[in-house]
Swiss-Prot record:
Protein known as: Large ribosomal subunit protein bL33c
Origin: domain of life: Eukaryota
Family matches, as SUPFAM superfamilies: Zn-binding ribosomal proteins
Organism (species): Cuscuta exaltata (Tall dodder)
Xref: NCBIfam families: PRK00504.1 (NF001764), PRK00595.1 (NF001860), rpmG_bact (TIGR01023)
């Protein structure tokens, strides 16, 4: 019997506020702080966003789901 896609998928949450800018204002590196978690694809089809602690910013910031 064929099995459908897994319901639980592994996602990466990345800090949205700790982006380094170069001289011209272009983003060099975004989201140094990353968390790995799982989500249920059926219950949360949209991208996850959590307030998590960023050790680089040294405060709680918004962490959003990124593509794998």
């Amino acid at each position: 019997m064929a099995k459908n896609k897994d319901v639980r998928v592994t996602v990466i949450l990345e800090c949205t506020s700790c982006a380094q800018n170069d001289v011209h204002g272009n983003k060099v590196a975004t989201g140094i702080s990353r968390y790995i978690t799982q989500k249920n694809r059926h219950n949360t089809p949209n991208r996850l966003e959590f307030q998590k602690f960023c050790p680089r910013c040294y405060k709680h910031t918004l962490h959003g789901e990124i593509k794998n």
